[in-house]
């Protein structure tokens, strides 16, 4: 869990420093740039000869511009109007990632930073759980990987990945109609 959180913090920090865009972490593993998903992170744990290894996959949309069928998606370019040379971008990111991974923060600090960076934290949002929509407020993520949400009809509850969906794109669509 802490490697997931720390990786998300590293990616968020890199993109925020590079672009000056609003960069938030959408629990558990996406980066939101100016309201659009610009990055996804996947971490897989493997055991080989009694040693645990982690494979970290980070997909950053850098220059893509066509998201006509993906209303929640964006890229560094569409979120910031900044264009980067992909090789230079990749080299900068790689150096930043390695330096931060080698100097890992204490777990309590990671959890605090992660929670400060959560997308839609302490804001009324629309969630879908078991095909039912209701309002709720993201309170925090915990050390076990759960997201705590205060739901309008059910009170404070914890959720694991894929047990609930934040429908953040509906908010933008509603805002655009007003």
Segments the model singles out, each with a brief description of its role:
Residues 2-23, 33-178:
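Long, positively charged amphipathic alpha-helical accessory segments at protein N-termini or as interdomain linkers
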